[in-house]
């Protein structure tokens, strides 16, 4: 049974891990292998982000990942590519600050698709909300090296601000590791993304289990 948009967005509002592909850091494993391990370990949101492949390769990978996410009842969010999102029937698209504005993308995709926007500042958060984004990516919380030109860390203070004032769900991202995850949760984040910590792990399933344990222990406390 397919989820309504509101049910999908509930995943962003709850304590959750937001999975992200990053083949460059995956120790020789393919995006498909990594996504399968994430889904088998209970991750319900997958963002396909791949900057250095041809459009044809991205399309073919996305089709495979879409099938996997359907099997596991998970969401697929496509980074940057509005057309690719539509072609593979993904659940939504994630836009960077250099991409098209969310309000213009909404005109193309309509109300049923989820639109996320990367943000680094309070002004960008407020603009994303104003433009009708469904959620934001907030970061990098700590120093991060997954992007070619990383933004300076925004720190836990910004996470605290978003937890209090942001009117839509946010995903804390950037430099989050097993050892500092609890600090991010304490600052008010619920949905978190640990990119290289997961994809670069020797044992992805075991790593995700440890992360879930930290999240569940925090929820109980």
Swiss-Prot record:
Enzyme Commission number: 2.5.1.3
Which note does the record give on the cofactor? Binds 1 Mg(2+) ion per subunit.
Provide the residue positions that the database annotates as binding 4-amino-2-methyl-5-(diphosphooxymethyl)pyrimidine.
47-51, 79, 118, 147
Task: Name what cofactor the protein needs.
Answer: Mg(2+)
> GO CC annotations?
cytoplasm
Q: Name one Pfam family in it.
A: TMP-TENI
| Keyword Secreted among UniProt keywords | no
Keywords attached to this Swiss-Prot or TrEMBL record, sorted alphabetically, are: Magnesium, Metal-binding, Thiamine biosynthesis, Transferase
Q: Where does Mg(2+) bind?
A: 80, 99
Q: Which reaction does it catalyse?
A: 2-[(2R,5Z)-2-carboxy-4-methylthiazol-5(2H)-ylidene]ethyl phosphate + 4-amino-2-methyl-5-(diphosphooxymethyl)pyrimidine + 2 H(+) = thiamine phosphate + CO2 + diphosphate; 2-(2-carboxy-4-methylthiazol-5-yl)ethyl phosphate + 4-amino-2-methyl-5-(diphosphooxymethyl)pyrimidine + 2 H(+) = thiamine phosphate + CO2 + diphosphate; 4-methyl-5-(2-phosphooxyethyl)-thiazole + 4-amino-2-methyl-5-(diphosphooxymethyl)pyrimidine + H(+) = thiamine phosphate + diphosphate
Tell me the route in metabolism or biology where this protein functions. Answer: Cofactor biosynthesis; thiamine diphosphate biosynthesis; thiamine phosphate from 4-amino-2-methyl-5-diphosphomethylpyrimidine and 4-methyl-5-(2-phosphoethyl)-thiazole: step 1/1
Enzyme class, broadest EC rank:
transferase
Please give the coiled-coil regions recorded for this protein.
none
Q: Is Coiled coil set as a keyword in this record?
A: no
Entry's Gene Ontology molecular function annotations:
magnesium ion binding; thiamine-phosphate diphosphorylase activity
Domain of life from the UniProt record: Bacteria
A Gene Ontology biological process noted in the UniProt record is: thiamine biosynthetic process
| Annotated 2-[(2R,5Z)-2-carboxy-4-methylthiazol-5(2H)-ylidene]ethyl phosphate binding sites | 144-146, 175, 195-196
Alphabetized PANTHER family for the sequence? THIAMINE-PHOSPHATE PYROPHOSPHORYLASE (PTHR20857), THIAMINE-PHOSPHATE SYNTHASE (PTHR20857:SF15)
Identify its protein family: Belongs to the thiamine-phosphate synthase family.
Protein name from the UniProt record: Thiamine-phosphate synthase
- Organism whose genome encodes this protein: Caldicellulosiruptor saccharolyticus (strain ATCC 43494 / DSM 8903 / Tp8T 6331)
What is the gene called?
thiE
């Amino acid at each position: 049974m397919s989820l309504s948009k509101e049910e999908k967005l509930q995943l962003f509002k709850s304590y959750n891990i937001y999975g992200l592909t990053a083949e460059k850091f995956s120790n020789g494993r393919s995006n498909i292998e990594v996504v399968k391990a994430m889904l088998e370990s209970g991750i319900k949101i997958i963002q396909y982000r791949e900057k250095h492949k041809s459009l044809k390769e991205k399309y073919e990978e996305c089709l495979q990942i879409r099938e996997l996410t359907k099997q596991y009842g998970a969401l697929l969010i496509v980074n940057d590519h509005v057309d690719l999102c539509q072609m593979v029937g993904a659940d939504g698209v994630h836009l960077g600050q250099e991409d098209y504005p969310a309000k213009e993308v909404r005109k193309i995709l309509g109300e049923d698709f989820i639109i996320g926007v990367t943000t680094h500042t309070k002004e960008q958060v407020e603009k994303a909300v104003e433009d009708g984004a469904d959620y934001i990516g907030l970061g990098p919380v700590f120093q991060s090296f997954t992007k070619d030109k990383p933004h300076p860390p925004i720190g836990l203070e910004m996470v605290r601000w978003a937890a209090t004032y942001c009117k839509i769900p946010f995903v804390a991202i950037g430099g989050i590791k097993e050892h500092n995850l609890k600090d991010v949760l304490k600052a008010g984040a619920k949905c978190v993304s640990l990119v290289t910590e997961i994809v670069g792990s020797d044992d992805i399933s075991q790593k995700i289990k440890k992360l879930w344990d930290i999240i569940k222990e925090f929820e109980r406390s």
